[in-house]
Amino acid sequence: MYAIIKNGGKQYKVKEGDIICFDKMGLEPKTKVEFKEVLAVDNGELKVGTPFVEGAVVEGEVINEGRGKKVIIFKKRRRKDSKVKRGFRRDFTRVKITAINA
């Protein structure tokens, strides 16, 4: 059984027991989370919502929050003595999917 959920403008395919990294939600560890924007559910037969499946809820539990690996953005213009170096680290919330109710 799997579901496709929407969170933070992105779509994720999840199953029970999956650990997913979402964009930062600002929640404490061990907090229960409900995702009500369920786009599709498959439990033997596929139910596709218009745009969401009515009555379907995906439940999860926050494991932790953290920061991803650093990504270096380096721009250089040749022969101009011009260069820019920037770094970026993505903040994320790690969630374990506990139940899919459809």
Swiss-Prot record:
One of its GO terms (molecular function) is structural constituent of ribosome. InterPro entries: bL21-like (IPR028909), bL21-like_sf (IPR036164), Ribosomal_bL21 (IPR001787), Ribosomal_bL21_CS (IPR018258). Signal peptide: none annotated. It comes from the Bacteria. Pfam families: Ribosomal_L21p. GO terms for cellular component: cytoplasm; ribonucleoprotein complex; ribosome. GO terms for biological process: translation. Belongs to the bacterial ribosomal protein bL21 family. Part of the 50S ribosomal subunit. Contacts protein L20. This protein binds to 23S rRNA in the presence of protein L20. This is Large ribosomal subunit protein bL21. The gene is rplU.
